[in-house]
Amino acid sequence: MAAVPGGARALWWPPWLLLLLLGGPRGADGYFPEERWSPESPLQAPRVLIALLARNAAPALPATLGALERLRHPRERTALWVATDHNTDNTSAILREWLVAVKGLYHSVEWRPAEEPSSYPDEEGPKHWSDSRYEHVMKLRQAALKSARDMWADYIMFVDSDNLITNPDTLSLLIAENKTVVAPMLDSRAAYSNFWCGMTSQGYYKRTPAYIPIRRRDRRGCFAVPMVHSTFLIDLRKAASRNLAFYPPHPDYTWSFDDIIVFAFSCKQAEVQMYVCNKEVYGFLPVPLRAHSSLQDEAESFMHVQLEVMVKHPPVQLSQFISAPSKTADKMGFDEVFMINLKRRRDRRERMLQALHEQEIDCRLVEAVDGKAMNTSQVEALGIQMLPGYRDPYHGRPLTKGELGCFLSHYNIWKEVVERGLQKSLVFEDDLRFEIFFKRRLMSLMRDVEREGLDWDLIYVGRKRMQVEHPEKAVPRVRNLVEADYSYWTLAYVISLQGARKLLGAKPLAKMLPVDEFLPVMFDKHPVSEYKTHFSPRNLRAFSVEPLLIYPTHYTGDDGYVSDTETSVVWNNEQVKTDWDRAKSQKMREQQALSREAKNSDVLQSPLDSAARDEL
């Protein structure tokens, strides 16, 4: 045995003892039975009560309830509090069907239906907020708050019946913010959202420079604001939450009798700061309608929210526990509705077909000509020649194969219109978004056109107005229609049999230019006179809807922007790429702002144009 300093003898330790002392099991896995214990379990998910108030909400409920089902919070830790009253539709039946189906999945369900009466005595219509309606809603919210407190819920989340919570993590994300009152910023088709950045001394909305940067997410985070509404979370664990109330109004309250303002005042008096978070896309809500609006307006407004969701997100999934209403598609009074789509653009095709389905529009899917797949021999076999002297106005390049394919796609539809003798047809491309009340507004316009006996060949439904120096001429006695000046884009248009014959009669394949340059030539509004000399007569009777009913889904520079026409190759030389303009394309930039003098202010307006309230 080796010697050690000081003459001490080295001790020999058995290996099993070293293992026990230095590296053996310990703690929860103690060596002796009495030393073992189980690790601590994680905390349970907080208890949340979700409060839903619904009135005449039948069109929205399948989607709204489906979104609530997909919230990633344990259902056994979630209670439902649902109230409905003053209905003229089947809101009560839908909610009852849903609650019966899900009551075994959630911690508890409280159901407060009232079948009668169907209206308030002081209301002017179903969308009018009278004092008695405000008071009733405040009492219901207070009842939900009391139920949450009585069951010792940690949180209560209020959700309006037409708010779509598309982000399933919304609830957990709001809880993580650790705020007494916090709302997820909801998106809409306009600047409207579920928060205010400013409030006057009388409690009314006040415009502030802070609002738009938050609404557009130029600034991201959670922001202190004087008002949140529609969908928001209250942390009932916070001591200050005990002083919050929806009803009755605070004794010092003298502002307008409005449920959201009353609650904002309650928060102010309790020294509870409201917050809105815009870190992610949480969901969507409709822009409020005017008091005179109908339930049909409301149903179509919510359907438009679903269309807007689909522009950049998957379609809204409906509840799996209730039967979805059936839809009956039609052609809107047209002989045919065409929808052009490249076979390789499956995502666009599926989105457009779903959007048309939601609006109950029947269409014939037309496979677009893929110019990029055409070789020189195929082009020559069709007798295609480029218009002498044509150059793209922004880049000086010739026609691209993508533009060639786009032209042929429309050209083939014009041929079909003539061959089938279709008197009036509607043509859609696949990269567009619909304005609110699209179907009803276009059908109303076409009735006006027919009533007045207007001689027309083509009507733009979506376009980019290029002549911005002076207004276009309004059409007398026809609402929402102007005589079209120089325009870009063929997003959507109505074409007559006579118009299709005129376009084919111009023999455009032998002197081709982009289709949205060809059309202005044919109605004699193209600014380049040299192009017009190759076509005669130029007597296409072209008009445009005003305001427009169709816009692009994406503009140059937007996330997800893809062009199959500009990012291609030159039509007769596959070696010359045109992909340089993907980020700088002027053609697909958003319509520039028009001066007051250039706006089409003389056009007759439809009542549907003003159905929605001011966006803020």
Regions found by a protein language model. Name each.
Residues P42-A45, T64-R77, N87, E97-K103, ...:
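Short, acidic, metal-binding catalytic loop of nucleotide-sugar glycosyltransferases
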Residues V48-A57, T64, L71, A83-D85, ...:
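A conserved hydrophobic helix/loop-capping motif in glycosyltransferases and polysaccharide synthases
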Residues P62, N90, M138, Q142, ...:
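Acidic donor-binding/catalytic loop of UDP-sugar-dependent glycosyltransferases
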Residues L68, D85-N87, S161, K343, ...:
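Conserved short acidic donor-positioning loop in nucleotide-sugar-dependent glycosyltransferases
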Residues N90-D154, I361-L422:
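Active-site-proximal specificity loops/subdomain of glycosyltransferases
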Residues D150, L164-Y204, R440, L445-H470:
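Conserved donor NDP-sugar-binding/catalytic core segment of glycosyltransferases
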Residues P184-S188, M199-V225, H229-S241, M466-D485, ...:
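Short, flexible, basic/aromatic active-site loop/helix in glycosyltransferases
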Residues D187, T231, P251-D252, I261, ...:
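An acidic/histidine-cluster motif and surrounding catalytic segment
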